[in-house]
Amino acid sequence: MLGYADTLSEQEMKNLARFIYLKLGLKEDVSYRPAEGIYVTEDLKIKPDTVIRGLNVPWGLAFLPDGDMLVNEREGRMLRYRNGVLIAEIKGVPKVHAEGQGGLLDIRLHPDYRSNGWIYFSYSGFPEKGGEGWNTSVMRAKLKDNTLVEKQLLFEGTPPLTTNFHFGCKLTFDTKGHLFFGVGERGTMKKVADLSNDWGKVHRLNDDGSIPHDNPYVNTPGARKSIWSYGHRNPQGLVISPFDGTLWESEHGPKGGDELNLIEPGKNYGWPFITFGINYDGKIISPDTAMVGMEQPVTYWVPSFAPCGMTFVTGKRYKSWEGDILMGSLRFHNLVRVKLKDGKVIHREVLLNNIGRMRNVEESPDGFIYVSLEEPGMIIRLVPVQE
């Protein structure tokens, strides 16, 4: 997580870093590639296999039934790959606000995609009715001749804001077809406890965008009916456990205090009233790490590792990791494995050190783990090495 994301654009920060680097007399390494040797972990050996190169901040990743891969680049392109080769840039993608941390974000197929053809994706968009600012939006569409058709805007975060950070927004489905997604607080801080806005919340919709009748705040006057939980800073991972149906969220803290949360309906997860982190300038955000009526994280990290992307391992290919959570790290360029037992963390392991700035982690239908990397942008598959 970048400490000056509300002051400098991402490109300005890259340019500043490059200027400092060259002033120190260091030579740029433009040929960097993640090592493709064998990585030895506690339980097994892994060989990274590069599947796609040449991407520009690959954010979302989805697998079509025919084996093709859809990749969202943050700048606003949705790409279709077959066996690692680009075969089409998808047409009809809505205009996105690709500044700071915004852009074209996650992508997810409906659980019954084979029968209904719905594709869901999130992005930082412009208000449909016009006006200042931009918001986290969720749309669904169908794919015909590599063009998005039958587009339906399901969610548009309100009110729109002009900040360029903390958009969220990962997508996941439960077994009943409910769509969950997290929306960042966009710098609103204490306003995340206000149920009349969408910021700093996990939301739940039916697959057609309607509100489920059993959402926790459907009968609360003035509340946004889609809210499932609140008190979140910037959710960057969201996944339903394939083992017990529980909902898990990874969250960027400030300077310290990244979290892994077990999400339950109607619960307040505390930001910014409780936190294990401090502000980037060293100032205290809150002296408290716990308060009555606010949930504690299942685990947290100090210093922050900037979790991004998260998946459960089913064990099809990695039997010794079955039931574990894998989380990407933007800051430390590695993968974090979290072992759970009865809803509690019993072990953590850092994997694939220095492999690259990790944006997303997904398990494919055939059980392989895929991760997307930035700078350079690529997608790699983790192949278990048999002894």
Task: Annotate each PLM feature.
Residues 223-262:
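Repeat-solenoid scaffold signature
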